[in-house]
Amino acid sequence: CVPDFPDYHPEQPGGKPGGGRTLECPVFAFGELGDWRDRVTVSPYWPNYHIMVGETTLCQAVPEELPAEVTQHRIDNDERGLGQALIGRLLRGCLDRGIVPETDCRAVELLIEHNAVAGVVIDGPDGRFTVRAPNVILATGGFDWNSDFTNAFLRGPLDTSVAVPTNTGDGLKM
């Protein structure tokens, strides 16, 4: 957990007005992904993805930049933090298990049979198709770029985001 990072909904059961419920992964070395390394989308709006949320000056009472040698080591070794660290680990886990992710696709519907997820309907570059599977991982990101969702679920206006532009709430829509 990231101490002192604001809770999005502190008034909800389990909410913490002082923050501390935001989770993050340690940095992940993207070289472990082999040929998949460059297939992970990087936000054009946040160039320093080599840090973790707890290392940003937003989470510090007295802002202190990460030491230059630490940042340079992470850049040299392509060690990424923030959402990149989570995605890198999830992707590595899939690849280790022989699971090949569908990319450049949008999940549009979950197939539900007998009150359980039985697959997913996908819009891909070659059209719509269905994947039936006993397990489905929705790696759809957040909803930063969906103004209807940000207005409904976040406090105050969100005029811009540093997230990847594909964070449009597809998982929540389903």
What are these model-predicted stretches?
Residues 1-126, 147:
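Conserved redox-cofactor binding core of oxidoreductases
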Residues 77-84, 124-127, 131-174:
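Glycine-rich loop(s) and the adjacent beta-strand/alpha-helix scaffold that form part
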